Amino acid sequence: MVLIRVLANLLILQLSYAQKSSELVVGGDECNINEHHSLVAIFNSTGFFCSGTLINQEWVVTAAHCDSKNFKMKFGAHSKKLLNEDEQIRNPKEKFICPNKKSNEILDKDIMLIKLDSPVSNSAHIAPLSLPSSPPSVGSVCRIMGWGSTTPIEVTYPDVPYCANINLLDDAECKPGYPELLPEYRTLCAGIVQGGKDTCGGDSGGPLICNEKLHGIVSYGGHPCGQSHKPGIYTNVFDYNDWIQSIIAGNTDATCLS
C-alpha cells in the first residue's frame, strides 16, 4: 500500500487519513530550533496539513498535491504552543503548477510554486534555502524535516517538527517497491534500505536537503511508513530549476520538462 504524504481534508480521504495531519518524521528526533529556517508550515482551519520551503523572500515551493483552498503559510515556526517572536504568516497571492502535469497522475510533476501576498523578512528563524546547481549524488546523506508522523501507524501529536538523516538511493533500489514509478515522473528515492527512518503522513511538500540545497520535495511513499525496501519518493527539484526560474522571472506560461 502506498501513501500520498498529505492529509486531504475532503470526504472519504479525510476520514481515511485525518489522524495523520499533525504527525511527524518517522525515526527522527526533534529538530533543533535553529536548523529549519526555510521550513514553512502550510495550514488551514483544521491545522497543519503540509510543509513547504522558502526559496526567496516572496516564493515557496511545495508539492502540487498540497494545493488546497483557503490555506495560509507560517514562517519561523517551531512549537505549535510556544510562538517564536519572529514568526510571520502570509497568504498565497498566486499558485503555479506545471501546465503540462497529468492531472490524473499524482506523482507526475508533483511540484507547486507559491508567490506570497507580501515578502517575508529574514530573521533569527527565517531564511531561504538555495536551489541545487547540479543533481544530487547517490549515497548523499540528506536531511528530512516536518510536522508529519513519528510513528508508522499509530497517531502521535508532537508540537514541534522532527528531523532525520537518510540516504539518497539508486532508482534500482526503489523500483521493486514502486513498480508504478515512471522515469518521466522525475523523482528521487531516499531513505534507509532496512527501514526505520522516513517521511510520513503530514510531511508532504517538505524538503529533502542534501549538501545544504533543496534537492527534493516530499511526495509519496509506502504505508506504513518506514518499511524496508520502500523508501520515500521525492520530486527532483533540479529537474525543475528552469521552470522555477522562469516563473519567478515573470514567464508564467513556462512549461515543465515532459
UniProtKB/Swiss-Prot annotation:
GO terms for molecular function: serine-type endopeptidase activity; toxin activity. Disulfide bonds join 31-163, 50-66, 98-256, 142-210, 174-189, 200-225. The keyword Zinc does not apply. The active site is at 65 (charge relay system), 110 (charge relay system), 204 (charge relay system). It comes from the Eukaryota. Its main location: secreted. Keywords: Disulfide bond, Fibrinogenolytic toxin, Glycoprotein, Hemostasis impairing toxin, Hydrolase, Plasminogen activation, Protease, Secreted, Serine protease, Signal, Toxin, Zymogen. It is found in: Secreted. Expressed by the venom gland. Residues 1-18 form the signal peptide. Glycans are attached at residue 44. Pfam families: Trypsin. One of its GO terms (cellular component) is secretory granule. The keyword Disulfide bond applies. Residues 19-24 form a propeptide. Its EC number is 3.4.21.-. GO terms for biological process: proteolysis. Residues 25-249 form the Peptidase S1 domain. SMART domains: Tryp_SPc (SM00020). Does not show fibrinolytic activity against Bbeta (FGB) and gamma chains (FGG) of fibrinogen. Does not show activity on prothrombin (F2), factor V (F5) and factor X (F10). Does not induce platelet aggregation. Monomer. Belongs to the peptidase S1 family. Snake venom subfamily. The recombinant protein has fibrinogenolytic activity against the Aalpha chain (FGA) of fibrinogen. Activates plasminogen (PLG) (is 4-fold less active than urokinase). Has weak thrombin-like enzyme activity. This is Alpha-fibrinogenase albofibrase.
